[in-house]
Amino acid sequence: PILFCPILTWMVEELMGRGIERFFIVSDKRAHDMMRPYVPENADVVYVDGARHGEELLALLKDEKGSVLIVNGAVLPVGVFSGGAVYSADAKECCKVLKEHGAFAAFPKGAEISKGFLPVGDDEELRSAQDMCRRKIADRHFAAGVSIMDPNNTYIDPRVKIGSGTVILPGTILRGRTVIGKNCTIGPNAMIRDCTVGDETEVNASQLNESTVG
């Protein structure tokens, strides 16, 4: 996980927000059951057996129209350039590659490299990416009218929702599916996990778990 959130969860929710409607997740068949809890319930997902992914993906994509987004490996929705780990191509061109190689071993014709993603191959790269992720999340909340007094001393899970006019004070940790209302003051030194905090509520130096406040 990064900032308390599994990478798979963050990526699926981010891509759904960008308009991706259907997901084909390729992995070892034995891992499918382990992955399901980390995928949003409202996501349209097909799990593909990694050992037979070429033929299975070909069967799934043959009737698809339009563009397909390919994500290779663990990737975070931050950064400037994906280095080719994330790219889009026409479904028909994707099928041609699968027929020829049995996998996405080459870029489909007309493929476009997608920006705004960061591949992470190991724990060290994941740790290095944390500051960038924290900044991206803070910027999203800034744009929505939230004030974060010290972004370098505030940790917000990407799943958290915060209403406009709310002020987040230093030392605050917001985790899980927490929802903070409008015009609240949170912190300093508050830890809130999987809670709903109503509008115009103040939470000061408290630890809240799975609760509704305000």
Regions found by a protein language model. Give the residues of each.
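A glycine-centered loop/beta-turn motif at secondary-structure junctions
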Residues: 83-118, 125, 129
